[in-house]
């Protein structure tokens, strides 16, 4: 039996400013750093030893993982995967969510954020927010870099990576993944067999480890958030 731990990065600067972030490489707020350290404290208090670490390519996820490992005093090298990046929000990138609710209506913004296969219009490649213009993504093949994505698109890349690279390692290893709200929602849809309606309602809190207990056949025995006060409804448990 083993543990799979999913951690959404701690609060980022653009989380605080209520902006659509997507692939823009913003860092953690001071509160986000505290959330990451608390995540490490909770993992340590539950006596869970991590064998393998993964994070997305994005600074907020990498720094969350760095702070967790510092608390755990664990110097293992983590594996970085762009497939675990946040969903790309296309032309919405950098815009304020509350302002967009006023401009487009709350239901339309909710559709953009939570529908399964709706993509916002693509982001102009000349934008400084476009991933092709961000140094962190120079290693990614240009034909893999999105202009916009739906949750379905995010699901396909994140879950394909999980199935191809991570899943066969979960039998004998405790694995921690530091990622993002939508890439973690995508993984939860796969792991918990959620339908499209359920996934639209799933909220992932920042910096709160979701611990999934797997049996020897990779079936889920149980799961829980370690920070009970900030836990969200898991829909299926």
Stretches with model-predicted labels:
Residues 7, 104, 179:
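A conserved hydrophobic position in a structured secondary element of the catalytic/binding core
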Residues 11-69, 79, 142-160, 201:
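Loop-to-helix element that buttresses phosphate recognition and phosphoryl-transfer chemistry
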Residues 229-237:
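Short, cationic low-complexity segments
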Residues 217-230:
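Short, well-ordered strand-loop elements centered on a beta-strand within folded domains, enriched
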Residues 40-131, 137-139, 189-213, 237:
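Phosphate-coordination/substrate-recognition cap region in phosphate-metabolizing enzymes
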Residues 4, 62, 70-75, 144-145, ...:
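Active-site-adjacent alpha-helix immediately C-terminal to a catalytic or transition-state-stabilizing loop
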